[in-house]
Amino acid sequence: MASTSVSRTVPASPEKVWSLIGGFGALPDWLPYIPESVAVEGGRVRRLKNPEGEVIIERLVDFNETERHYSYAILQAPFPVNGYVSTIRVHNVPGRDDVAEVQWSGRFNPDNATEQEVTDLFTGIYRDGLDALHNTLTA
């Protein structure tokens, strides 16, 4: 099983960051790669579309409001992986209430791709996503 993790310090309090990204259907609010998110199954599943119209279906598998993190599994996607589970987490930065550290991590099994290829793919997705979050917070 492969894994990757990317962290980024962003210029907003952990509470403000979580209020933006903590909703399972909130990806279009901060992630340009996902312009559409539709909640199904009572909000436990999100049906996403990317700019090319490809469908990604994800299931919420863990949510913790107090600790500011959630995990999800990909059920369907155009990515060469299976067994994908990812977590988005907002951390406090000691001694600072005006910034937060956001960590996006995942583990997955390559499917018709090498471990390095899928690790590079998701490292890039997470990095670009956290860059987009930073840009949203500074706009």
Descriptions of predicted regions:
Residues P28-P80, H91, D128, T136-A139:
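Glycine-rich portal/gate segments that line the openings of hydrophobic small-molecule binding cavities
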Residues P11-P14, D62-T66, V90-E101:
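A short, structured loop/turn motif at beta-sheet edges
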Residues S3-S7, G43-V45, V55, H69, ...:
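Intrinsic-disorder/low-complexity, polar/charged segments enriched in Ser/Thr/Lys/Arg/Asp/Glu/Gln
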Residues L75-D128, L133-N135:
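Beta-strand/loop substructures that line and gate deep hydrophobic ligand-binding cavities in soluble
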Residues V10-A12, N50, P110:
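Short beta-strand-to-loop capping motifs
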Residues M1-E41:
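Hydrophobic ligand-binding cavity/cleft-lining segments
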